[in-house]
């Protein structure tokens, strides 16, 4: 038996990292590709980087020493001395710089729109589609033809392999397009520009949708309400051709009842006392406004698709808040318009009426003065009223997520609209949110007062529709 002599005193040859010139050589490229192929074996056995084996049960697919999955590190450990201060790192085919670029740019896979992990086979792709394409090419797989032209997305990319491979080819994946090294600055700049342009396109599309929503709501507002702020302000400021008839005492009230609201007081209440007649007229006006608000709500995108019970609930709790918000448009510090703007009843006369009916309108005037100070126009009010109706926190709602989604869209477009329409008042939006809370309190107090009137005023019958709204409200 011959003896092998080993010179233990000779110096070991320390391996050094490869230079750029070495990496650019064809031989190095082939060697590195072989290393990449070994690294990706476990990823390509199962789609999307997963394997049919559990790593804990089959350690040769894990990262244990000597395993295939850790060949990059273990190969280095085998070739270099134990005392070596550093290990060799082989660049992946896509390049760590490109992987970092993909992550920083949030690029999507060109095939399935999942998050791209790098530049694979000529396009930015995710690990799943990279492995799928490599497996198909290497194994020369042929898939059953599909004529449905399936849409390939992250959630369904494994369902139709034929269409997935066709998508890979259509977006430009090619086995000959493997690239080594860093992403050129010019290409990175181009990618950044594309991402920014894509983001801007998305923002522009979202803005267009919001503007469309605002326009639909505003058009519905103008269409469904007999009185709006533009008309009311023209009358209240004396710009209308026919000034309203002023009701300031019992005599002028009787005159108005014979002309302006003759139909309202002709149903057997003309002989009742003034407070009862006024309460009756207020109810008639409220019923008409509830009808207008119902038609307006139906024009809000998505409202009629809601559960019917939810539609009723939203209107039940929202109509009076919306009504009092719009009532402010026909009010000033001295009084309010009535009879479609043909009459004007003074604030002092309303306060002089017998209690509790005499207490009914004063809280609305106090709210209106503060609300009118915000100087909203009809486009602002239309969105505000829509937001009041579509509130997802009303009691008894069934499909809350859908309603909250509607409300979120409306409130968002309201905020953007206020920023555009009132650029000098940055606090207008939070002020309006506070007004929503104020309106809830106002409606609660009004409902309590109506119940008091119902109990104490035997002649003051409540309209059936309003009675249904008030039932179990608060």
From Swiss-Prot:
Pfam families, per the entry: Hormone_recep (PF00104), zf-C4 (PF00105)
SUPFAM superfamilies assigned to the protein according to its UniProt record, in alphabetical order: Glucocorticoid receptor-like (DNA-binding domain) (SSF57716), Nuclear receptor ligand-binding domain (SSF48508)
GO CC, one annotated term: nucleus
Top-level taxon: Eukaryota
Official protein name in the record: Peroxisome proliferator-activated receptor alpha
An example Gene Ontology molecular-function term: RNA polymerase II cis-regulatory region sequence-specific DNA binding
Assembly and oligomerization: Heterodimer with the retinoid X receptor.
Family of this protein: Belongs to the nuclear hormone receptor family. NR1 subfamily.
InterPro entries reported in the protein's UniProt record: 1Cnucl_rcpt, NHR-like_dom_sf, Nucl_hrmn_rcpt_lig-bd, Nuclear_hormone_rcpt_NR1, Nuclear_hrmn_rcpt, PPAR-alpha, Znf_hrmn_rcpt, Znf_NHR/GATA
Gene Ontology biological process terms from the UniProt entry: cell differentiation; fatty acid metabolic process; hormone-mediated signaling pathway; intracellular receptor signaling pathway; negative regulation of cholesterol storage; negative regulation of inflammatory response; negative regulation of transcription by RNA polymerase II; positive regulation of fatty acid metabolic process
DNA-binding region: 106-180
Domain NR LBD: residue ranges: 245-472
Gene3D superfamilies, alphabetized: Erythroid Transcription Factor GATA-1, subunit A (3.30.50.10), Retinoid X Receptor (1.10.565.10)
Family matches, as SMART domains: HOLI (SM00430), ZnF_C4 (SM00399)
Free-text tissue specificity from the UniProt record: Ubiquitous.
Keywords: Activator, DNA-binding, Lipid-binding, Metal-binding, Nucleus, Receptor, Transcription, Transcription regulation, Zinc, Zinc-finger
Compartments where located: Nucleus
Zinc finger (NR C4-type) in chain: 109-129, 146-168
Task of the protein: Ligand-activated transcription factor. Key regulator of lipid metabolism. Activated by lipids. Receptor for peroxisome proliferators such as hypolipidemic drugs and fatty acids. Once activated by a ligand, the receptor binds to promoter elements of target genes. Regulates the peroxisomal beta-oxidation pathway of fatty acids.
